[in-house]
Amino acid sequence: DRPGNIKNGIESINILEIDQTAASIFYRSYKSNFSDTTLATVGDQILLEIKSNEAIQEPSITIASNPAAVVDNGGNNWSASYSMQDGDSDGIIPFEIGVVTDSRGNPNSGVISSTTNSSVVIFDNTKPLLNIVRIISNNSDSTWAKIGDSISVTFKSNELLTQSSASISIESAELTPLSAQKYVAKYLMQSSDVEGDIPFAISFTDSVGLSGDPVSETTNSSNVIFDKTAPILDYVHIESNNSNNTLIAITGDDVFLTFRPINTDPIITDSIIVTIAGQVANLSQNGSDYVGTIAINGAIPGGFLSYTIDFVDRASNPGEQVIVTTDNSYVNHDIVPPSIDSVLIYSSNFDPNWAKSGDTVFVEFFANEQLGSMNINISGRDSSSYSFEGLN
C-alpha cells in the first residue's frame, strides 16, 4: 500500500493469449464439373477449394465476378461454387478470395486471386467456327470430277473440336485429322451420284460440347462439278475445197472435218485428236466449231476418205470415237483421170451424117465418170452449149 506494506498476491488461473498473426490460405485449387475439369460452359459448376492454417471466419469469395456459395467443410477446409451463366465472359474464369479474418479477428493482407497448384478453368460460351473450308477433286482439272474421282473437303476450325462429321454428295465421307484444328473429308464419286455441283455438309462440336452451325459452303468460293456423262458431238461434217465439187478431192486439195460438241458439255481442246485418211489433221477452232484439216497428196489411197475424232470433256470422260458424219457428208479421193470411152457426132439434118447452114451439129460422148468442166470444139469453133445426161 502507500505506506509500503507488502502482501503476496494469489496467481490467476486465467491466461490471456495475444494473437496478432493473420491466417494463411496455403492451398487453393480450381476445377469445373465438366468431363475436362479445366473447361466449362453455361450450366457447368465451378468449384474452388481452399485450406487455411487455422480456423477462419466464413470468407467472401467471388467466381466470374459473381458471389459464390461458400461451404465450411470442417477442419479448416472450405469450398466455393458457382454455376456459369450465359452472360459470363469467355476465357479464364477469375476468382477472388476477399480479406480473410481468423477466429480472433486478425485480417490477412488482402485479396487472393490465384491458385497454389496453377489450376485454371476456361469458360467457353461461343460456338466454334470453321474459318477455312475448301473443296477440290483429284481430277486433272480439280474443279471437275468423274466417276471414281476422289473429292476432298479440307476445313480448319478456330478452336479444338471433339466431334466432327462430314458428308459429300449426300454420302458419309471419311474424315481424317491433319493437325490439331485441321481436317480433311474424302469421298469417291459413284455412278449413282447426281451430276452437277457436288454438295457437302460439315457438323462439328467443340471441347465443351457446343455445336457450330452446319457448314455447306466454302470460304474461297471453290466448287467441284460432277460429270458422269460421256461428251457427244451434235454436228460432224466433211468436205473439200475442190473448185468443182466439194464431195471430191484430188491431190493438192484440202479436206476439212468440222465438228461441234453439245454446248452444255465442253471438251478439252488439247485432248482432241483428228485423223483423216490415216493422217493426223491440223486442228483449229472457229467459234464453237472445231476443224481438222489435211492436204491431199499422192500417197493417200483413192476412195471415200475415212476419219476419226477422239476427245474428252472437262471431267476427263472420253467420248465415243466418231467415224461418221451427222449429215451423211463424205469426200471421195479421186485418183483416176477422166477418160472418154466413146464419141458420136451427128446433125439435125434429115440425114444426120450431113449438115447444111443452119443445121445443128451434136457431139455425144461417154466418160468413165462425171465430169466437172470441159471444152468442146466443133469445126474449129467452141460449142455454144453442152448438157449432162445420166452418169456417163
Feature roles, as predicted:
Residues 34-37, 58-88, 96, 115-116, ...:
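Extracellular beta-sheet repeat scaffolds used for adhesion and glycan interaction
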Residues 1-2, 10, 61, 80-103, ...:
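Contiguous beta-strand segments of beta-sheet-rich domains
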Residues 52-58, 157-163, 261-269, 367-373:
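Short proline/glycine-enriched turn/loop motifs at strand-loop junctions of beta-rich domains
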Residues 34-44, 140-149, 244-253, 349-359:
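Short, solvent-exposed loop/linker segments at the N-terminal edge
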Residues 45-50, 150-155, 254-260, 360-364:
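A short beta-strand segment in extracellular, disulfide-stabilized domains
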Residues 52, 78-80, 100, 128, ...:
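Extracellular/surface recognition and adhesion modules
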Residues 4, 41, 123, 142, ...:
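Polar, enzyme-active/binding microenvironments
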